[in-house]
Amino acid sequence: MALGPGCRAVRGCRPVLKRAFSLHKAHSVKDMESILQLVRSVVPALTTKKHKGQDGRIGVVGGCREYTGAPYFAAISALKVGADLSHVFCTQEAAPVIKAYSPELIVHPVLDSPEAVRDVEQWLPRLHALVVGPGLGRDDALLENVKGILEASKARGIPVVIDADGLWLIAQQPALIQGYRKAVLTPNHVEFGRLSEAVLGVPLDGGDRHGAVLRLSQALGNVTVVQKGEQDVISDGEQVLECSQEGSGRRCGGQGDLLSGSLGVLAHWALRAGPQKTGGPSPLLVAAFGACALTRQCSQQAFQKYGRATTTSDMVAEVGPAFRRLFEA
């Protein structure tokens, strides 16, 4: 990414790359507010004229014997952000556990079935977005089924958020989402390094996170990439955003699932609203920024109450208040 003279040393300095801009670590409140305003513009109004399902039917693909919390956190977060219906497509062993967590989720025990792809594919016409990977695990048979589900989702043009072991699959087979611009990858530091090695053949450049995320997105054909970290760096290969909404120092497991579930809903809303509402940034960039800001705000609010004892369940309880504070105040 080309920068103006001395740009790296100047707070709030913007790159000169065409159509790209970056909100740096010490970006102005005005810049943050302008992006948050774009997120607000895609949030649908709650009215009595709507019917169930119009504001989002989200599917989460993941959940196995070892990992039942992750798909629950993603699916329940989608509901709390504002989706009307939230489905979980998991293994047979995981289903009773996830059902027991919440009666509000629609749980399908099909992911380890020989007919898993067909079973999930029949639901795709009813879904607005998929979140793939929370609690998936790395069983070869499950990954093969998820590969088929991804191909079917792409064929229907369904937005796909990929996290956790879904990213492991992409690192093994990047062609699965190459050029699919309705995909969003949400890697943490380790997952991003693995993707960078697999796609670019180079180790992670920790000194230039903005450039690293931009290059990975471009190499994948402008798939949106969210590198989670002290600040979240987001790029669609053309633009780069940085979200440094205040969060907390607590790093309990499950926060990424809250982000991915939230992002599934926001992606649907942003794509439905279209670029005329999101202005310069693409709809998925705006959605990703919104999900990052919301997750950080939930973390901050939960930490203020529980401090070191904060868990992701505490953060999920803050989704409603945090959403109102950021997007409906």
Swiss-Prot record:
Transit peptide stretch: 1-28
GO molecular function terms listed in the Swiss-Prot or TrEMBL record: ATP binding; ATP-dependent NAD(P)H-hydrate dehydratase activity
Pfam families to which the protein is assigned, alphabetical: Carb_kinase
Modified residues (N6-acetyllysine): K49
Reactions the enzyme catalyzes: (6S)-NADHX + ATP = ADP + phosphate + NADH + H(+); (6S)-NADPHX + ATP = ADP + phosphate + NADPH + H(+)
Family recorded in the similarity comment: Belongs to the NnrD/CARKD family.
Protein's name in the database: ATP-dependent (S)-NAD(P)H-hydrate dehydratase
Protein source organism: Bos taurus (Bovine)
